[in-house]
Each structure stands twice: as structure tokens, then as C-alpha cells.
Amino acid sequence: MNFLFSKVKCWLLLLPGMLFACSAQSVKKESISLIEGSPAVFAVEESYQIFLRIRKPALVKIKVGRSVFSGHTNGIRPSGSKVHAFTVPGKLLDKVGLYEVICQELPERRPYMREVKRFPEKSFMYEFKALPAENVRIFHIADIHNRITQATATAAAAGKFDLLILNGDLVEHMASPSSLETALVLAGNMTGGRLPVICTRGNHELRGKFAENITQYMPNHQGKLYYQVKCGPLYAVVLDGGEDKSDSHPAYGNTIDCTSFRKEQLEYLRSSALREEFKVAQSKYKLVICHIPFPRYMGKSTADEEKRLFTVYGEWSKELKTFLKPHLIVSGHVHRKLIQHGPDFPAPVLMGAALDKKTDIVSGSMLTLAKGKINVDFIDHLGKKGSGERISNP
């Protein structure tokens, strides 16, 4: 879909349905009223995690081809949660190219459900586009700090893409339950539930009253926010740098233990199972995705505890450089649009998003994967494009 952005004001792009309007005529209004916005389809390991926001208490299930996924937890189908999540095999959804959301309103849940009025099931069909084998376009954005309108407009200005990366600091802090849904809102707005999304947590998502509940609203692998992604010609390792200062910093009030969390990820990178995955991935486009551009901090030393923080970033970098040999590290955090190279870096580091708090201009980046190379261009929500850089496979 092409947008003549210079001739259309930003708010016009944000009509109901956002960037993608469903064309299915068979969808009933009752079904639409149950589903808030569009689904978000996150790539995790070899699966997709489909997140839905439901306005009323309801039973929800996903159907892909002949396979049905109920989203049960230990045999119980949830009905009271606003957010419902389902894991479906990646190869299955890629092949079928279509999934059905089936909702059944359930206003009351009793020990014996025959006493409760039963509502009919209503369905909503979504097309899904798997990544192409070549010429993959990836739109990347981070550090929007609640500027949902501008971020959605930046995605529109970027034009057509095949995969979305939401790379942290999407909020200022987790102040309310709605803050937890920000990634789901953005993913739905920008893809309409039709494209895969990779999502990371930024340091600002660790802050606030509701920060501890984030895994209920965000893609994860067995509760962990670090994992690998196998999606078409792309292989990625998603890492989480946690907070950007030492655990003992007075701003955190002893509420975090990112030191242990980073060491846990180091052990993950050192695991023999993951190293075997790295060998298999050598024919793919290889990315490392992390909100904090960790290679640029390794080797720095200030206070003893912060020195340990920067040391573990160096260990991460060493493991990745030795065994994965990634083509690009994709990050945000610094609110700058640049690509940094370093002799000890595992790969060039893209800092591919920016927020100018004086003007509220939000910028992202477009990565094009083609013919063994990655091309990077920058764009803001006003449609202004910046020069990019081409990175060849090592």
C-alpha cells in the first residue's frame, strides 16, 4: 500500500482500521464490537503468538486451517481477561495464510454453566502474509514514549513493509493497565494483524506500578523476554538489557535485579543448544535485536557495579561475534539515527529510532534484506527520509 504522505495530513491516516482496513464483508458488527482494534502477531522461536484485546468477557479461540487453539491454561479457557494470547505453529500459519478469531460472549461464569445464557459464536477472518524469501522490508521503531499517533504515521510514511520491529521504550512508564497494551495497540495499528512483529522491552517498560505484569501483554518464551526468532529468511536473537543504570541507583529503590537477568542471558548465549542453532542459521540474514545498543557500552567503567554491567555487555558481544556472527545489531535507546562500527563489535550497531521531544517528531528506520545485503534508511512521521547505509554479509 503506497501513501502520498506529503499530501495527506497525519491524522487522516488514523481512521478506524488504521493502516489496514478489513475488506471481509461477512464480518458481523457484533464480532467487531467484541474485538478492540486489530490482533498483534508476534514471532517467537518457531511460532507466532497472537494477542487479542477483547472488550467484554468472552471465550476466544483461534482456528488456522483445521487446527483450533483454545488458549487454555492448564485446561481452563479464560473468559475474564481483556487480553487473550494464543501460540500457533509458524509453518502452519505461513502455509495457510489465514486465521479465524472465534468469540463467544460469556457475561457470567458459574460452577455449572447450563445456568448461564449462551451466546452464539461469532468469527472474524484475518489474512496473514509470511515473509518473502528475498527482498524483505522491515520497519523498525522505538523510543516513542507514548507518541502512538506519530509512530503510526511514521509507519504509514515508510510505505509497504513485511515485518515490524517494536524495539522498546514505547511508553514513559507502566503507569496504568492501558500502558501494558501499548505494544499491542501499535502492532495492530501498523499491521492490521496481517504481518509478523518482533517486540522487545525497553528500560522504561521496567518502571511503574504495572511493570511486573508485562509478560501477560508481551511476547515471551516460557515467561522469558529473550529468545530466538526463526521467520522465513530471517534468524534473530532477541535480548533484553534491562535498566540502563546499576541496580543500586536510587531511582529504582531496590525494585530491580537486572544484574542476575543479564547473567542469565549470558548463560543462554553460551548454551550448547543455542550454539547449534547459530550453526544452522549461517545461511540466513542474522540480526540481534535489543533496545539498548550494548556493544557501544562494553569496556566502559565508572562505579564498580556499573563496571560489572558493562563487562557483561562485553561478554554478550564476545559470544555473538564468535558463534553467531550477526550481520546487524538493531537497537534504539539513544534517540539518534546512526550506525556505529567498532573493532570488537559483533556487527555494526543500528540505532534506528529517535524522538525529538522539542518538536515531537518521531523517526524510525527501514531495513531492506536483499541479495545478501542489508540496506538501512531513516524516515520520520512527516515523511522526511534520510540517507542510509548498506551492510554486506561478513
Q: For the regions a protein language model found, what residue spans apply to each?
A:
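Bacterial N-terminal signal peptides
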Residues: 11-19
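Active-site-proximal segments of metal-dependent phosphoesterases and phosphodiesterases across multiple
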Residues: 279-327
